[in-house]
Amino acid sequence: RSMESVVTFRQGKSTVDNAQLPNVERVATYLNNHKDATVIIRGFASPEGSQEVNERIAKARAEAVKDILVKRYRINASRIDAQGNGVGDMFSEPDWNRVSICTIDDKEK
């Protein structure tokens, strides 16, 4: 079983807006209710900016979500894999690619 949650960011930013916190909380709630579950957070950037900048922002976006899970929701950091994936191309609209995608992997059957 898996669950996905998408956290969006403003251009050039890697801080999680208050409006996005429910999407982080969904992940935290799931992890707290399923102690064997882990989450991969993949940060992405939209295409403007240099590759170096985009890779840094993408990683920072993943880390920002991880920080909230660890600090606010007391999720063990070892259950969270935060990755920067550079420029995203999942969505046709470039602006929509400013995201962290949280994919929960639940080993429970």
Residue ranges and their predicted role:
Residues 19-21, 44-109:
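Periplasmic OmpA-like peptidoglycan-binding domain that tethers envelope proteins to the cell wall
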Residues 1-38, 93-96, 100-109:
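Periplasmic peptidoglycan-binding/tethering modules of Gram-negative envelope proteins
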Residues 41:
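Conserved phosphate/oxyanion-binding catalytic-loop motifs
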